[in-house]
């Protein structure tokens, strides 16, 4: 294992996709075009590639066809399958939520998450959604995480309140004076005392072991 190596998980299950019907009826928000030639997912994959991450798990709520057709082998980002690593896609996670997982271990909602993380052999994992278009230096985020010795590092951006006010699917990071996260709340529940607000980019960095522990707790409590 390379010291401080990273893998990445992208969760393309954003509930706001329903507000973009019919565009997102058969595809996640991450597959929608941006500036004509790009897709929203391209920006996340570029940040992942530039950080030297070579193992990416993409979990898709519904059909993954639009994602498969676009990313193909991942060669555009240097993520084509090697001896170890590559892009691994897991679709129809919504169906697993509906069907339940009591009968067979292979139908367990989190089995693919756990298998991907363990086989990546990475020490840290970047977890993100797919709808935020942003350029993020994930190596800098890892350096920050290591320097501050936190459990989880949340990536956010200070933006004018108009960017998030009245957007029910956006999250505001409520920070303490030392910039440690106090809680995440819906943009509708924030009282906006200042002109700027810490807008969550729905990206996190944490140790793989910590995420596996979180998954185990969620599984025991029936959280999907």
Task: Kindly give the residue locations of the regions a language model identified.
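Short loop/turn motifs at secondary-structure junctions
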Residues: 52-54, 121, 149, 180
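A conserved hydrophobic position in a structured secondary element of the catalytic/binding core
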Residues: 62, 128, 206-207
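Conserved beta-loop-beta/alpha segment of the NTase-like Rossmann-fold superfamily
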Residues: 84-171, 218
């Amino acid at each position: 294992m390379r010291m401080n190596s990273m893998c990445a998980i992208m969760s393309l299950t954003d509930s706001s996709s329903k507000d973009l019907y019919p565009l997102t009826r058969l595809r996640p928000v991450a597959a929608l075009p941006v500036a004509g030639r790009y897709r929203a997912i391209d920006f996340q994959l570029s940040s992942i590639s530039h950080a030297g991450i070579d193992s990416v798990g993409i979990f898709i709520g519904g059909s993954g066809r639009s994602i498969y057709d676009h990313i193909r082998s991942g060669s555009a980002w240097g993520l084509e399958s090697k001896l170890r690593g590559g892009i691994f896609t897991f679709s129809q996670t919504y169906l697993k939520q509906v069907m339940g997982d009591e009968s067979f271990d292979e139908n367990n909602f989190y089995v693919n998450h756990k298998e991907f993380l363990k086989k990546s052999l990475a020490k840290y994992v970047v977890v993100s959604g797919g709808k935020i278009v942003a350029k993020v230096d994930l190596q800098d985020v890892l350096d920050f995480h290591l320097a501050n010795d936190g459990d989880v590092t949340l990536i956010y951006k200070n933006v004018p309140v108009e960017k998030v006010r009245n957007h029910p699917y956006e999250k505001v990071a409520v920070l303490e004076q030392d910039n440690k996260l106090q809680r995440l709340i819906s943009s509708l529940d924030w009282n906006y005392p200042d002109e700027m607000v810490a807008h969550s980019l729905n990206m996190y960095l944490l140790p793989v072991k910590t995420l596996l522990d979180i998954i185990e707790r969620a599984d025991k409590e029936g959280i999907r």
